[in-house]
UniProtKB/Swiss-Prot annotation:
The gene is KRTAP10-4. Residues 36-395 are annotated as: 36 X 5 AA repeats of C-C-X(3). The keyword Repeat applies. The keyword Repeat applies. Pfam families: Keratin_B2_2 (PF13885). Belongs to the KRTAP type 10 family. Interacts with hair keratins. Sequence repeats lie at residues 36-40, 41-45, 46-50, 67-71, 89-93, 99-103, 109-113, 114-118, 119-123, 124-128, 129-133, 135-139, 145-149, 155-159, 160-164, 172-176, 186-190, 208-212, 218-222, 228-232, 233-237, 238-242, 250-254, 270-274, 275-279, 280-284, 297-301, 307-311, 317-321, 322-326, 339-343, 349-353, 354-358, 373-377, 391-395. Restricted to hair root, not detected in any other tissues. This is Keratin-associated protein 10-4. In the hair cortex, hair keratin intermediate filaments are embedded in an interfilamentous matrix, consisting of hair keratin-associated proteins (KRTAP), which are essential for the formation of a rigid and resistant hair shaft through their extensive disulfide bond cross-linking with abundant cysteine residues of hair keratins. The matrix proteins include the high-sulfur and high-glycine-tyrosine keratins. It comes from Homo sapiens.
Length: 401
């Protein structure tokens, strides 16, 4: 009976500690029964992986992790390995989401067994506290905040840390959750500068300084959230009226649909008052591209079903094919009025009756359709490039050979 050395092979097997009656508690090499041995790469339930085996065999019961053997300490949450820890032992841990979410100490969550990693150390969860160390408590970080915050360094900081609002008004310094200056006394009912607004205009009176009717979605998507939902008498970014100066009485809120306002290329001037021309309800394709000769034909050409549905000028939305819409180039000529039907941008617009039957006779007796077979009739709308079998009459099979 001999103690294991660096060579642990025994007929391509490695002996386990005494797992049967014939094996003792010590590791055996010479007289170990095959029932006590396994292949060189043991299962985790049998022994530690090969990189963790030391020169003197150690029972697997003393190995608490597949990362490091018992000689590779200290504990998992400490800063590093001991001097005897080899790089092969310092592997990354398989971080679990549950660990990262539920750990009370996220800075040291999900670290490898013997090494330290930053795989689960969000930047925004580092407390940013004031000089008073007594207030430096753990922040109640929310996952969504840490993920979506544009400034993760100051995301979800404790209450004792510096709030987002400036120090002009102490009443504004609420909890620094960056959520709502609207609900706080930032925007007073009086016309004076506040932390959430650079200031009202000079002609602003206290009676007009009411809360704006801005929707929360507007405040969320605004590029300048601090000045989003400000009093009505002040200038806003997301709901700026674009009214004509000569007619201020008609400057009411436009009936623009939210979808229109969302998809508008110029959101700042989207939902403008009724007295002004809305930008969002003027599609690019609605500009008529018609000849000036026919006024009945010169109507709007939207070429989009959505425009035709939502446009306030539906009578001129989908124009006939005598005009040239950008996306619906007509296939009919202007000479034939019967051909000027509603354009559906499909070959079905033109019938095959426009094509003249073939009068050519094939010398080789082949019923082929040559390009000359489908010469369009004057004012016919069939493309010259399409040669369909219905246009051609079968060859009479008269052969000179």
């Amino acid at each position: 009976m001999s103690v294991c050395s660096s060579d642990l092979s025994y007929s391509s097997r490695v002996c386990l500690p005494g797992s049967c009656d014939s094996c003792s508690d010590s590791w055996q090499v010479d007289d170990c029964p095959e029932s006590c041995c396994e292949p060189p790469c043991c299962a985790p339930s049998c022994c530690a992986p090969a990189p963790c085996l030391s020169l003197v065999c150690t029972p697997v019961s003393r190995v608490s992790s597949p990362c490091c053997p018992v000689t590779c300490e200290p504990s998992p949450c400490q800063s590093g390995c001991t001097s005897s820890c080899t790089p092969s032992c310092c592997q990354q841990s398989s971080c679990q989401l549950a660990c990262c979410a539920s750990s009370p100490c996220q800075q040291a969550c999900c670290v490898p067994v013997c090494c330290k990693t930053v795989c689960c150390k969000p930047v925004c969860c580092v407390p940013v506290c004031c000089g008073d160390s007594s207030c430096c408590q753990q922040s109640s970080c929310q996952s969504a905040c840490c993920t979506s915050s544009p400034c993760q360094q100051a995301c979800c900081v404790p209450i004792c840390c510096k709030p987002v609002c400036s120090g002009i008004s102490s009443s504004c310094c609420q909890q620094s959750s960056c959520v709502s200056c609207v609900s706080s006394p930032c925007c007073q009912a009086v016309c004076e500068p506040s932390p959430c607004q650079s200031g009202c205009i000079s002609s602003c009176t206290p009676s007009c300084c009411q809360q704006s009717s801005c929707q929360p979605a507007c405040c969320t998507s605004s590029s300048c959230q601090q000045a989003c939902c400000v009093p009505v008498c002040c200038k806003t970014v997301c709901c700026k009226p674009v009214c004509s100066e000569d007619s201020s009485s008609c400057c009411q809120q436009s009936s623009c649909q939210p979808a229109c306002c969302t998809s508008s290329p110029c959101q700042q001037a989207c939902c403008v008052p009724v007295c002004c021309k809305p930008v969002c309800c003027k599609p690019v394709c609605s500009v008529p591209i018609c000849s000036g000769a026919s006024s009945l034909c010169c109507q709007q050409s939207s070429c989009q079903p959505a425009c035709c549905t939502s446009s306030q000028s539906q009578q001129g939305c989908c124009v006939p094919v005598c005009c040239k819409p950008v996306s619906c180039v007509p296939v009919c000529s202007g000479a034939s009025s019967s051909c000027c039907q509603q354009s559906s941008c499909q070959p079905a617009c033109c019938t095959t009756s426009c094509c003249r039957p073939s009068s050519s006779v094939s010398l080789l007796c082949r019923p082929v359709c040559r390009p000359a077979c489908c010469v369009p009739v004057p004012s016919c709308c069939a493309p010259t490039s399409s040669c369909q079998p219905s246009c051609c009459r079968p060859a009479s099979c008269v052969s000179l050979l």
